[in-house]
Amino acid sequence: MIKVGIIGGAGYTAGELIRLLLNHPEAEIVFVNSSSNAGNKITDVHEGLYGETDLTFTDELPLDEIDVLFFCTAHGDTRKFMESHNVPEDLKIIDLSMDYRIKSDDHDFIYGLPELNRRATCTAKHVANPGCFATCIQLGLLPLAKHLMLNGDIMVNAITG
């Protein structure tokens, strides 16, 4: 079993992640961190998970008990956390915020769009998950780019929410 921790567990993205992990045969959620909801049941916030879990939010961070840590935090918070906490060297991290999406010499996160970067994503220690608009645009344009069919300006109209 892959032992998972989640930071920023009260948001919409975290709710969907929790739902996916609860139904994953090889994942076990060890903790869901939310300082503002510590002690409350996850289903108090994510009502759609009622009957699926008895987990509660915690303000603790038992990083040494997990294999993978997901960040479902506001933009900027993942970077602050990484700079201010002693994160175990072997801990895999998947960031769902925008903090590490841009390639830089100051971090080792890889851009985690599997359709574009599958090999690197599978072996990476740190993965920066692309945002919804970037994913929409890239998945739509990658097949055209692969066949050299993008010859002019491109306009994308996308809606989220």
Describe each model-derived feature in a short phrase:
Residues M1-G161:
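N-terminal Rossmann-like NAD(P) cofactor-binding subdomain of oxidoreductases
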